[in-house]
Amino acid sequence: MFILRVHSVDSERPISVEEEESGFTYASKRAQPPLKLIQPSLKLTDRKGLIHLYRKSSHSSLPNPSSRSTTLFIVAVPNYLSSLDFIRFCDSRISQVSDILFIRNDGMEDRYSVLITFSDQSEADGFYNNLNGKKFAPSEAEVCHILYVMSVEHTEFDEVAAEAPTGFTELPTCPICLERLDPDTSGIVSTLCDHSFQCSCTSKWTYLSCQVCRLCQQQDEILNCSICGKTENVWACLVCGFVGCGRYKEGHSIRHWKETHHCYSLDLRTQQIWDYVGDSYVHRLNHSKIDGKSVEMSTSCLSHQGDCGLCECSEDTGISGAIFNSKVDSIVIEYNDLLASQLKGQRQYYESLIVEARSKQESSIAEAVEQIVVNTMQELQNKIEKCEEEKSGITEVNTKLIKEQDTWRKKAKEIEEREAALLGSKDEMITDLQEQIRDITVFIEAKKTLKKMSSDTDGIREGTVLPVPISPEPVSSVRRQKKSNRRK
């Protein structure tokens, strides 16, 4: 049973039958009867969105009565069929349909999908049995693929639509990619041709919007991993078309599965499909090594190349199984021994690389330290020489200043002595002048007295002369006498 999630980018729009009939359609090239079987209660709507198709991880073959529902999903309808052309394709089985929703994707203009809801389970089963696997047009290659849908969810968020429900895995919506999957995986029971991507049928398909189909048709181009660019062991995701290298290279393909949970990947060289969840191949067809033709692939076959003589699906399962198990055991032992020896060699090799790297690191560190020490010593030596030059200059200046200091000291002492002598001579001169002034003053006063006495002669005549006591001669008079003598 399938679950459908639609990332809607707009709301549902009703479709007018009259407007559709007035337009040009692919079917209008031929004479088509008018649409008289459409019930008035039929709801025809159109919507744009991106479809995500999910199926239960525990696969089971179809048809299965317990996995039916009244909602059917047509995977891919070619765009040359208009809405009314598709209704004409359904013919009289459209009478019991209650709702038809056409889902279109702007990124896939060559096809659209259809969601049909029936009012009765028997009518849904009849529609499925009569139209599933039928060509849309006799001259075209496209086949109608119908799936039973358990539930349909519409969301405006791409993250919600792209997240797989618990226990479900996402399937591609391209019909060719679905047909190449195992029936237990895709839910498509049969196919009209092998779709080996080299037959004329594939070239007539118009689904060039499928990235995987374009990659398979580009036989002349060299395909490479979209992450690392490797050209060997390249795989393509069936759901989104991501191209990555296998697990024996950089493992970008399996990394993509872990990130997006898109578990189906196509080997672009062998056209084989691998299921990462089931850890096995799930492709419907395999190419024979002998004649290059496509042969049916058993789902229980364990061999990569589809050679059932080496696995449990052969006729004699007991003997073949024992032989296969013994071969597997011997190969496992051989590869374990080889792996152990290789790991030991790799360990020794990487240990030697580590030792060499450490020695190189230590030598480089020692050289760097030595260079730093040399540079530091050179800088210190330059500073010492500069300081010594400054010291010698300062010493010379200091010596010169000391000499000048002694000279100025002598000059100052001489000046002090000269000033002291000059001051002494000035003091003596001042003292001498003072004594002279006093003498002159005494002389003048004595002269005045004598003049006065001369005018009064009578008093002198009647006077008495008395003796005057002799006093020691003052030093000043002695000095004056010396000076007077000196002057003489």
Swiss-Prot record:
List every stretch annotated Disordered.
453-488
According to the UniProt entry, which residue ranges have a biased composition of type Low complexity?
465-478
The protein's UniProt keywords, in alphabetical order, are: Coiled coil, Hydrolase, Metal-binding, Transferase, Ubl conjugation pathway, Zinc, Zinc-finger
Q: Which GO terms describe its molecular function?
A: hydrolase activity; protein heterodimerization activity; ubiquitin-protein transferase activity; zinc ion binding
A single Gene Ontology biological process assigned to it is: protein ubiquitination
Give the ZnF (RING-type) ranges.
Answer: 174-214
Q: Which reaction does it catalyse?
A: S-ubiquitinyl-[E2 ubiquitin-conjugating enzyme]-L-cysteine + [acceptor protein]-L-lysine = [E2 ubiquitin-conjugating enzyme]-L-cysteine + N(6)-ubiquitinyl-[acceptor protein]-L-lysine
Q: Which residues form a coiled coil?
A: 370-418
Q: A cellular component term (GO) from this record?
A: ubiquitin ligase complex
Entry keyword Zinc: yes
Pathway the protein acts in: Protein modification; protein ubiquitination
What range does the record give for the signal peptide? none
- For binding Zn(2+) 2, which residues are annotated in this chain's numbering? C237, C240, H256, H262
InterPro entries tied to this protein: BRAP2/ETP1_RRM, RING-H2_BRAP2, Znf_RING, Znf_RING/FYVE/PHD, Znf_UBP
Which Enzyme Commission number(s) are listed?
Answer: 2.3.2.27
Mapped zinc finger ranges (UBP-type): 208-301
Q: Which CDD domains match?
A: RING-H2_BRAP2, RRM_BRAP2_like
Residues crossing the lipid bilayer are none
> Any phenotype upon disruption?
Viable heterozygous plants seeds are slow to emerge from the seed coat; emerged embryos remains white with unexpanded cotyledons thus leading to growth-arrested seedlings.
Pfam families annotated for this entry? BRAP2, zf-UBP
User: How would you summarize the oligomeric state and partners of this protein?
Assistant: Component of the heteromeric E3 ligase complex made of BRIZ1 and BRIZ2. Forms heterooligomers with BRIZ2 via coiled-coil domains.
The free-text function statement in the UniProt record for this protein reads: RING-type ubiquitin E3 ligase required for seed germination and post-germination growth.
Name the chain's protein. BRAP2 RING ZnF UBP domain-containing protein 1
Species source reads: Arabidopsis thaliana (Mouse-ear cress)
Point out the gene that encodes the protein: BRIZ1
